[in-house]
Amino acid sequence: MAYRKRGARREANVNNNDRMQEKDDEKQDQNSKMQLSDKVLSKKEEVITDNQEEVKIADEVKKSTKEESKQLLEVLKTKEEHQKEIQYEILQKTIPTFEPKESILKKLEDIKPEQAKKQTKLFRIFEPRQLPIYRANGEKELRNRWYWKLKKDTLPDGDYDVREYFLNLYDQVLTEMPDYLLLKDMAVENKNSRDAGKVVDSETASICDAIFQDEETEGAVRRFIAEMRQRVQADRNVVNYPSILHPIDYAFNEYFLQHQLVEPLNNDIIFNYIPERIRNDVNYILNMDRNLPSTARYIRPNLLQDRLNLHDNFESLWDTITTSNYILARSVVPDLKELVSTEAQIQKMSQDLQLEALTIQSETQFLTGINSQAANDCFKTLIAAMLSQRTMSLDFVTTNYMSLISGMWLLTVVPNDMFIRESLVACQLAIVNTIVYPAFGMQRMHYRNGDPQTPFQIAEQQIQNFQVANWLHFVNNNQFRQVVIDGVLNQVLNDNIRNGHVINQLMEALMQLSRQQFPTMPVDYKRSIQRGILLLSNRLGQLVDLTRLLAYNYETLMACITMNMQHVQTLTTEKLQLTSVTSLCMLIGNATVIPSPQTLFHYYNVNVNFHSNYNERINDAVAIITAANRLNLYQKKMKSIVEDFLKRLHIFDVARVPDDQMYRLRDRLRLLPVEVRRLDIFNLILMNMDQIERASDKIAQGVIIAYRDMQLERDEMYGYVNIARNLDGFQQINLEELMRTGDYAQITNMLLNNQPVALVGALPFITDSSVISLIAKLDATVFAQIVKLRKVDTLKPILYKINSDSNDFYLVANYDWVPTSTTKVYKQVPQQFDFRNSMHMLTSNLTFTVYSDLLAFVSADTVEPINAVAFDNMRIMNEL
């Protein structure tokens, strides 16, 4: 094993004081090792400035001799004078530079698998309710009767389509639909049981209590409740629990139990869950030191590839997705360590440039902006942008030749597609007109805006020098290779970049350029270019290592991406300063950094959770669109369905998404098939709409309208009301058909002939129990409204309750007044609660444990970074 002597590459001219300061700094750094490791592992990144190294200066000065302390103080004084221009870093200190937009990062990391929520109750639409019974004279009896009523009767008053209620109900079912049910977890004690038996959930227990305490309950039913308990079949790992459910609720819960998404979990599944490239990477040592029980279960994540093709014509949405991926990626790219001391490197560069008082201005620019913060920032930006396929734009100054020469390295190792076209053309044109063409004495390139060829493509055809033309050819053809790995489309770098060989090609071209005569340029110009090339060529070994390090980190993190990496130019770009590229090239040390296993697993889990949630929300949206279509609500609800879909993905600012993309998204969603479970659930609702309408206090099955007033009748459930329980003797017209055709002539003719008409179809009604308001409304007949407006949807039939509970009841009794109404609500009787028909036995596994984080069972470690190898089985960084 090769060992490296710390500080071996520092220059010979660094004096003893600097060495002593370095040793003291290393001691200090070791003392704060735990603090640094905490900062590295923390999710919140921060910029570490140089002020921390001065905290214990006083203690260090006391330990040294008087003479050494004087020299040390002089060094510190000199450093303070240059602090504005130069940042000096301690060796082995990490320099995080990126402060993520924590809101987006938190939204991404907070997306958890839905199965994590524990089911404590069965799914129910109905609940049994006691209602009073009224005598013929309107007085309430002491007896009660049990009926099935809706738990959430959420239909609002007024002009509201009942079909919207069913769409909202379906949406509620989809939201509450469990991925698995374990009845043992929700079972509660039956208080009335003789032998401490259990029933399936707390609502069943409360219903049993209420029935048991009801004076009218038969003795046989009470005895049955006392016998209610679970039945265990241990040999089959099965348990049966008694439950009290409406038949429709029983159908729902039985379906959920039969179609659970849990699957058996074993070590092989966990092993295969880890991305294959990480399993096969010799730098990572993975162990599973636990045998799972036979009852272990997991829910397979839904990782279908993007069925909406968001990269195609969804510029705003795609920009948001790539931005969030970029922020996530930057948080997991490792920080560079042991960068070359900025001060020492600038001193060495100054020596190489032979800077003197009379040096031309251009060469002093070479040193501006070089610091380790920029180098680390550049490293993270390049890898994160490639992982998220974010387009980058380049910022540079044409007169800073060092930036342009560094840009030549950048264009060599990063595919052209990663840069916005305008920025790429500007950078290439600057390199051609500043370095390449002057070297050969060629005239400046006059580039026409909009030319399909880039400046490098034009230059490749015109330059005769083989090495330079060969390098230009490589850059012009440097594209990602699209490779499908484990069913995911990956954007892979060229092999010459991965192994670093391309840097030799770049250096050959640079050396050829530096040997040219620059015939049309002054000597100073030629010297500046040559010295800039010399600075970069002196670091050939480090640049090869840097390129290999960049490629390795990119490909290792790419293994954790689960969605196809589609390459499309993004609306916004990530800015990259070429001076930061210079910093990276000049300051890269010889310390290898690779992602920690914990970071990789975290990155993989966040990607899986977002991808799975994305697919589940697509399935929900497709199901709701299909339901809206079948309920004839397609036009009315479409935009809100798409908006809800985007909101549930967490990362989108829905208000800012352009309408054209909303409608394009709607069209794509319409073309997708409905998932089987969601379709079956909708069919269950559709088949039982009549029962659900009956159980609602706000939905009627029709309305009877007449020209003359109709007398109120006694109803057993409400007293005196304008409710009709059957339509015998009335002419019937279908409400849906009437609204579709808009032909009201038939109604008008019947009413003019004094024949009441029954309009049949689900519609809402407003409850009003005041007799005074009834008298006030008698003048405005519904008939007048229909003839005038010809709109049935303005019809609001009113349910009037006049009984012994009403404040106005005695008014009726005293004045012998017979209340009447021009409308009657047709309302079918809700289903009566029958204990025997509502008793169901539900069956599930006796026990199983669902694990949501499969990677928690894997213990992982890495080899010593210095020994980490790349794909070619050679050390990532060889320049020791």
UniProtKB/Swiss-Prot annotation:
Cell compartment(s), UniProt: Virion
Segments of this protein annotated with the region Disordered: 1-45
Residues the record marks as site: Interaction with the intermediate capsid protein VP6: A220, F224, M228, M839, M841
Residue numbers spanned by region 5-fold hub: 1-80
Family: Belongs to the rotavirus VP2 family.
Function: Inner capsid protein that self-assembles to form an icosahedral capsid with a T=2 symmetry, which consists of 120 copies of VP2, with channels at each of its five-fold vertices. This capsid constitutes the innermost concentric layer of the viral mature particle. It encapsidates the polymerase VP1, the capping enzyme VP3 and the genomic dsRNA, thereby defining the core.
Subunit comment: Homodecamer; each decamer is made up of two conformers of VP2, called VP2A and VP2B. Interacts with a VP1-VP3 complex. Interacts with the intermediate capsid protein VP6. Interacts with NSP5. Interacts (via N-terminus) with NSP2.
Protein name: Inner capsid protein VP2
Organism this protein belongs to: Rotavirus A (isolate RVA/Human/United Kingdom/A64/1987/G10P11[14]) (RV-A)
Upper classification of the organism: Viruses, Riboviria, Orthornavirae, Duplornaviricota, Resentoviricetes
